[in-house]
């Protein structure tokens, strides 16, 4: 799946959100002060959620649609529908879990490192577009990123 395009979208949302936010200090070169992020992480997660929610649903690629976002304290929770065609839910879970988890974790770790360092974590939930069955849940934290190296 083309998860890279999703990660680009998240980076753009993050940058545009903070560039216009009066409650945060002005940041040169799009750098985010880690201490400010830590102090305001729940507020930031809530603001990110509100901004991204305005654009939903959003087709990510031919298989994947971002259908909702919410924040659970300082965790951004993204929910996606996967349209797998004729492939069964069980086959997707069995065949795609490891590959998807690694790709999603690597992408989020690269695009959101400042947020992860500040304690703003990410959870990706993937559901079947047909059955609505939960296929995958990936929790991405700074610790998960450090395990990739």
Model-derived segments and their meaning:
Residues 80-84, 126-130, 140-142:
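A mature extracytoplasmic/lumenal domain signature
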Residues 105-136:
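A short amphipathic beta-strand at an alpha->beta junction
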Residues 43-44, 83, 123:
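Outer-membrane beta-barrel proteins and related beta-barrel translocases across Gram-negative bacteria
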């Amino acid at each position: 799946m083309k998860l890279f395009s999703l990660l680009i979208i998240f980076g753009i949302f993050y940058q545009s959100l903070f560039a216009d936010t009066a409650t945060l200090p002005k940041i040169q070169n799009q750098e985010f002060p880690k201490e400010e992020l830590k102090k305001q992480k729940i507020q930031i997660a809530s603001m990110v959620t509100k901004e991204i929610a305005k654009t939903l649903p959003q087709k990510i690629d031919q298989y994947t649609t971002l259908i909702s976002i919410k924040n659970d304290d300082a965790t951004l929770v993204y929910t996606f529908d996967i349209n797998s065609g004729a492939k069964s839910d069980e086959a997707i879970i069995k065949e795609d879990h490891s590959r998807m988890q690694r790709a999603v974790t690597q992408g989020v770790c690269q695009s959101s490192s400042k947020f992860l360092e500040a304690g703003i974590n990410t959870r990706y939930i993937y559901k079947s577009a047909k059955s609505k069955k939960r296929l995958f849940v990936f929790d991405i934290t700074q610790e998960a990123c450090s395990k990739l190296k």
